[in-house]
Amino acid sequence: MDSRIPYDDYPVVFLPAYENPPAWIPPHERVHHPDYNNELTQFLPRTITLKKPPGAQLGFNIRGGKASQLGIFISKVIPDSDAHRAGLQEGDQVLAVNDVDFQDIEHSKAVEILKTAREISMRVRFFPYNYHRQKERTVH
């Protein structure tokens, strides 16, 4: 039995836009050159944990949702908030909150989950490419 997966069954994966290094930087100097950052760890998923006292604000806004087909994104982080100190940033895609998948969720449901939770464990990834595409499509 052939265990290979047909090409059309592979998921579509969107990667951040890649910019080639400037031609004037010699290839052997590109790794550590200050004008070229090839560090991609900023795009890896990470977990943000927040505790919210009753009546307190989260310190960030979201936009998007199922209607945009691109997910929920952080659209604003209030400076010096707990969310800011935890490393949340504009352009982060919210993958899950408290083990609830946020990749195909209605905006209103996402807001409800975030507002009612006292402890929030968010799985996010920095995804500026889809964030900008999502901003162009929605008004949230």
UniProtKB/Swiss-Prot annotation:
Superkingdom, taxonomy of origin: Eukaryota
InterPro entries per record: MAM_complex_regulator, PDZ, PDZ_sf
Domain PDZ per the UniProt entry, residue ranges: 47-129
Keyword field contains Cytoplasm: yes
Annotated GO CC locations: adherens junction; basolateral plasma membrane; cell-cell junction; cytosol; extracellular region; pore complex; presynapse
GO MF entry, a single one: protein-macromolecule adaptor activity
GO biological process, one term: synaptic vesicle transport
UniProt tissue specificity: Widely expressed (at protein level).
Gene3D superfamilies (UniProt xref): 2.30.42.10
PROSITE patterns linked: PDZ
Keywords linked to the UniProt accession: Cell junction, Cell membrane, Cytoplasm, Membrane, Secreted
Subunit comment: Interacts with ATP2B1, ATP2B2, ATP2B3, ATP2B4 and ATP7A. Interacts with PLEKHA7 (via WW domains) at zonula adherens; this interaction is essential for the interaction between PLEKHA7 and the ADAM10-binding protein TSPAN33. Interacts with SLC5A6.
Function statement: Mediates docking of ADAM10 to zonula adherens by interacting with PLEKHA7 which is required for PLEKHA7 to interact with the ADAM10-binding protein TSPAN33.
Protein's recorded name: PDZ domain-containing protein 11
Species this chain originates from: Homo sapiens (Human)
Gene (name only): PDZD11
